[in-house]
Amino acid sequence: MTIVEDAKKGIITEEMKIVAKDEGLDPEFIRRGIAAGRIVIPTSPYRQVKICGLGEGLRTKVNASIGVSSDIVDVNMEVQKAIAAEKAGADTLMELGTGGDFLGIRKKVIDSISLSVGSVPLYQAFIEAARKYGSIVHMTEDELFNATEAQAKLGTNFMAIHTGINNITLDRLKAHGRYGGLCSRGGAFMSSWMLHNEKENPLYANFDYLVEILKEHEVVLSTGNGMRAGAVHDATDRAQIQELIINSEVAEKAHQQGLQVIVEGPGHVPLDQIATNVKLMKEMSGHKPFYMLGPLVTDIAPGYDHIVTAIGASVSASYGCDFLCYVTPAEHLALPNLEDVITGVKTSRIAAHVGDMIKYPERARQWDLDMGRARRELDWEKMYSLAIDPEHARAVRNSRAPEDTDACTMCGNFCALKIVNQNYNLAK
């Protein structure tokens, strides 16, 4: 039985107990959430992973994405990035390579970390078709499903599968047009294949077969968003919403068949449309776990898109987004390096916490309360321990060490907190 089938029968599994303990919740709450399709716990019969729950009522989680490109195939660097992402506090990792030996590279990455690992199988199928036949449009349907199964057997825990691109979705995209084009690689691959071959998307047309593969290998389905906007002026357009409708329908169908499902959301969304996107997705999908790629709230800040994303992600999480994909400073510019990955993870972790302060104030705000008290008391060791990046906080202060060890060089002898502590009591 799958974990969904266990949950529907009233069985509380060991994974549910682990998530409940980690979140400070009752195991029965986790069981009910999985049974209803509102919570997922990625696992695998092929490898032991760090158990992590995603969904309503749980802390907002952060995914880090890595992977070689056709220009840069440095396997050791990708392994280092995976290890660094886990150390920096990522909850999951997606290996999205588009070059080299697909299965060999993914195996090395999977073996290097304990996190749940996700993938996009159609990348492998389409790119291997381009190598073999000279063009992505000559991929066969069997090659697509074979790539999916091969990646599942490696121990991949969740997969972004572009089920929401069908002929209706594609018609809406072409009729409406886009200011920023189509930014999803998976969407570009699949739509080009469909138009050239004049055929329906195999992942949509053969959805029951896809579910069989994923169930057999206990892979969580993440409904890919190939029609997401690549520019804020295209956000929440007809093609995006059409894909959301289809993805919500297939998500419901998959869950009924015992599969865990995540629904993916858009990547470029202006601030005033975030609440609409989150609420629309939650209602349409029956409150499935919602995974947003970013989102980026402006398009004018290449080199600083991790900051742009932090703004959007914190608002998204506050409205109910459950799962955030990080964005690095290299977004739209280059393949991220090691430092970009670390920065992306930490920035998104901050955003996730900010969102949780609104979503779950009784749980999330204690961390900030403890930091406020430590600052009042000028307890630097406590402040370091509470910082989201203790090593960085300590290093910054030590790089400009104060004469007065109670204070910092911003205020020196005229530290407001120290002056008040010496003259009257404000403790609360």
Curated annotation (Swiss-Prot):
It holds the Pfam family ThiC_Rad_SAM. Substrate binds at M94, Y123, H162, S184, R185, G186, N225, G226, M227, R228, E264, Y291. InterPro entries: ThiC, ThiC/Bza_core_dom, ThiC/BzaA/B. Pathway: Cofactor biosynthesis; thiamine diphosphate biosynthesis. Keywords: 4Fe-4S, Iron, Iron-sulfur, Lyase, Metal-binding, S-adenosyl-L-methionine, Thiamine biosynthesis, Zinc. GO terms for biological process: thiamine biosynthetic process; thiamine diphosphate biosynthetic process. Its cofactor is [4Fe-4S] cluster. It catalyses: 5-amino-1-(5-phospho-beta-D-ribosyl)imidazole + S-adenosyl-L-methionine = 4-amino-2-methyl-5-(phosphooxymethyl)pyrimidine + CO + 5'-deoxyadenosine + formate + L-methionine + 3 H(+). Zn(2+) binds at H268, H332. GO terms for molecular function: 4 iron, 4 sulfur cluster binding; carbon-carbon lyase activity; zinc ion binding. Its EC number is 4.1.99.17. NCBIfam families: PRK13352.1, thiC. Catalyzes the synthesis of the hydroxymethylpyrimidine phosphate (HMP-P) moiety of thiamine from aminoimidazole ribotide (AIR) in a radical S-adenosyl-L-methionine (SAM)-dependent reaction. Belongs to the ThiC family. This is Phosphomethylpyrimidine synthase 2. It comes from Methanosarcina acetivorans (strain ATCC 35395 / DSM 2834 / JCM 12185 / C2A).
